Each structure stands twice: as C-alpha cells, then as structure tokens.
From Swiss-Prot:
Cofactor binding, note field: Magnesium is required for nucleotidyltransferase activity.
UniProt keyword ATP-binding, yes or no: yes
Source organism of the structure: Proteus mirabilis (strain HI4320)
Alphabetical list of HAMAP family matching this protein: CCA_bact_type1 (MF_01261), CCA_bact_type2 (MF_01262)
Every HD domain range: 228-329
GO MF, any single term: ATP binding
Record comment regarding domains: Comprises two domains: an N-terminal domain containing the nucleotidyltransferase activity and a C-terminal HD domain associated with both phosphodiesterase and phosphatase activities.
EC number(s) on file: 2.7.7.72, 3.1.3.-, 3.1.4.-
PROSITE patterns tied to this protein: HD
Protein name, as recorded: Multifunctional CCA protein
Length: 407
C-alpha cells in the first residue's frame, strides 16, 4: 500500500500558494485494509475515507468510465490493481494531476509541472469531455489563476467549445452551476470566468441574460468601450477591487441586464433599462436558486444604480424616497453596497478606472444625516399611524436640506 498527496495541494505547493485542504490517494489497498487501520468510510459512490487522526480525505485509487449523460453518469472502479497513473489520468487538468510521494518526489506522468511553468491550463486526456461540469471548473480555475498569468491551452478551449455545442451542459443542475459560479465570484478576477464561458459558448446556454449584453452598444460619450458586455466585465473587475462581498459582486454583474432587451431601433440608448432589468435578474436568480439576500440586492442594483450617479442633483424628498425604496432604515448595509456597485459602474469604463466617485461619499453621508433624526421625539408629539411616517419623512428631508446648505 502506497499513499500520495494529490490534486490542489500539490499544485498550490508548486505555485508557492498556501495549501488549504490536503487530499490523498491510496494505491494497492482495499476498503477493508483502511477500515482495519481505523479509517472511517464517508464516500458512498466511491471509496473515500477519513484519517483517524487528521480527518483528511484518503481515496482509493480509482478509474471512472462514462456510463450515462451529464456529470453524474460515471461508473467507478476502485481496486488494488488501479495504478497511480490510472488515477491521475481521470483528473481534469494536468496541473491537478501531479502526485507527491512520502519520499518527497513528484510523480507527474501528464507534464503538469511543465504546464505550471508555462502557466497553461490543459486537459489531461480526451476523457475531459465526458464531464460537462469541467467547462465551468476550467473557467473558474482561469479566473482564480489569471492574476498569476495563467491562460487556457488552445486545444482545451476547442474541447470546451465542442462540449458546449454537444448540448451536454443542459444536464448540469442549478446547484452545481451556482456552486462553481459562487466560487468564481470569490476569486480575484471573476470577470475571467464569464469571459471564458462567453468564449466557449457556454454563457449563451447558462447565462443568456448576460450573454445578450455582448454586441449591444451604449453611447460613446458615456461608454468609450461601447459594448455593454465588455462594460459589464469591466464593472465586475472593478467591483472586485472594491469589495470581497459576493452579493455586491453578483449585483454589479447584473446591473445592466435591462440593456440586453432594448429594441435594436433604440440603440445606443437604453431609457428605462434599470426597471426593465429587474425581472431578468429575478429569472436568473430563480433558475439557479441564488440566495434571497443576493437576489434582492441584485434587483435593487439593476433598478437604482443610475440614481446614485445623479444623487447630488436630486431633491431631498427624492433622496428620502430612494432610501425608503431600498429599505435602508432596516437594512443600512445596503447603502454601502449600492454605493460600491454604482462606483464600479462609473469606473468600469474605458479611461474612468482611476476617477473618484464623490456621489458615493454624498450618498453615504446623506443617509447618515437622515438616519440621525430622532423617531422618539416625533412619537412623543402624540402623532398616530401614518402621521408619524409623514412627520419623520419631513424631518429627514429638512435634515438633508440643512446639511446640503452647509456643503
């Protein structure tokens, strides 16, 4: 029985990145061997065991054979005669198919170390095309490792395009698509994930609302990059510099969905694209069962992101109505979230990347001033029901008027 460190831990070790989770493969053993040594079996579909002390995952070397459609249609074979090379061959990318022995030696039959040096994401074998989830996984790895200069090997991109054209992506469940997308949104360069999906044709199948933005022009005066799809990718790149909050990042991605359904005869103008985008955001979020908290913010971002660009010119009464509309009194965190989204929208344009966004400062400060109005003093006047609401709104307007007069 031989044990090897495999997968992401070996890859990250070679990249001098922090190693988070360690996975091990066991060659030349049976389930009984590991159970006798105190390992606990956790895998139902294939033999995975938890180490009795470290609780790290140890899997028996196995092969997988395509036996059905989708990413679940595989028959697993695990036995003592499965070699390390057999096990590594079923993995997706060469950089994930390197093993590290107890003697401190790398076993690299598919030249993953060469690809790490060349900064290439390359598939191990043609069996890659048997699992449609790998299209998303490679796009996610591209996003994760883009800051290190990694790109996808041309032959792997061709294979991803073939897989997309085959219709296999339709077998992916909502949960798996969102899980990969969520991980990508946590990466340093999430826009790369969507750019890769667009490049291989998967965006049209999985995220048609986002795909529809590519090729849609916006006025050059406001958008030197012109193409709304390119602008959206720039916004996602910018918002990722401003926050790690996945709800904010996803909402920034969805802020202009309404432009994807503007009639061609109205191009390059998109009047009312904010409210138009709300049902598109709703549909996307329902399809992938995206958490309500993310969905609600994304709908608000679609509807109101343009309001913040002109917040300094708004009447105080309209500013208060905006705070009401986004439920800011009960959810004050939305102020900062929407300010960041609108800032990313303003700066996610060619030539505007380093410009300040004073509207964000104004928006935050206006809320702070309005929120300082004492509700108890209004209630103590003996007002009832809607009269309290009206008086509170008026008082908040006055507070903003007085504050603006001092600016």
């Amino acid at each position: 029985m031989k044990i090897y460190l495999v997968g992401g831990a070996v890859r990250d070790q070679l990249l001098n990145l922090p190693v988070k989770d360690r996975d091990w493969v066991v060659v030349g053993a049976t389930p009984e061997t590991l159970l006798q040594q105190g390992y606990q079996q956790v895998g139902k579909d294939f033999p995975v065991f938890l180490h009795p002390d470290t609780h790290e995952e140890y899997a028996l070397a196995r092969t997988e054979r395509k036996s059905g459609s989708g990413y679940t249609g595989f028959t697993c074979y695990a036995a003592p005669d499965v070699t390390l090379e057999d096990d590594l061959q079923r993995r997706d990318l060469t950089i994930n198919a390197i093993a590290y022995s107890a003697k401190g030696e790398y076993i690299d039959p598919y030249h993953g170390i060469d690809d790490i040096h060349a900064k290439l994401l390359r598939h191990v074998s043609d069996a890659f095309s048997e699992d449609p989830l790998r299209v998303l996984r490679v796009a996610r790895f591209a996003a994760r490792f883009a800051p290190l200069g990694f790109t996808i090997a041309p032959e792997t991109m061709s294979l991803m395009q073939e897989m997309t054209n085959s219709g296999e992506l339709n077998a992916l469940t909502a949960e798996r698509v969102w899980k990969e997308t969520e991980k990508a949104l946590h990466s340093q360069a999430p826009q790369v994930y969507f750019e890769i999906l667009h490049q291989c044709g998967a965006l049209k199948i999985l995220f048609p609302e986002i795909n529809a933005l590519f090729g849609v022009p916006a006025p050059k005066k406001w958008h030197p990059e012109i193409d709304t799809g390119i602008h959206t990718m720039m916004v996602l790149a910018m918002v990722s510099r401003l926050t790690d909050d996945i709800a904010v990042r996803f909402s920034a991605l969805c802020h202009d969905l309404g432009k994807g359904v503007t009639p061609v005869e109205n191009w390059p103008h998109h009047h009312g694209h904010g409210p138009t985008g709300v049902p598109l955001v709703e549909a996307l979020c329902q399809r992938y069962r995206i958490p309500n908290q993310i969905r609600d913010l994304a709908k608000l971002a679609a509807k109101y992101h343009d309001h913040l660009h002109r917040i300094e010119r708004m009447r105080p009464s309209k500013i208060i109505r905006l705070f009401d509309a986004i439920d800011a009194w009960r959810k004050p965190e939305r102020i900062d979230q929407l300010a960041i989204i609108s800032e990313a929208d303003a700066r996610g344009r060619q030539g505007s990347e380093n410009l300040p966004y004073p509207q964000g400062v104004f928006f935050r400060q206006a809320f702070k001033i309005a929120n300082q109005v004492d509700v108890k003093s209004i209630v103590s006047r003996g007002l009832k029901g809607s009269a309290i609401r009206e008086a509170l709104t008026k008082q908040r307007e006055v507070a903003i008027i007085e504050w603006k007069s001092r600016l």
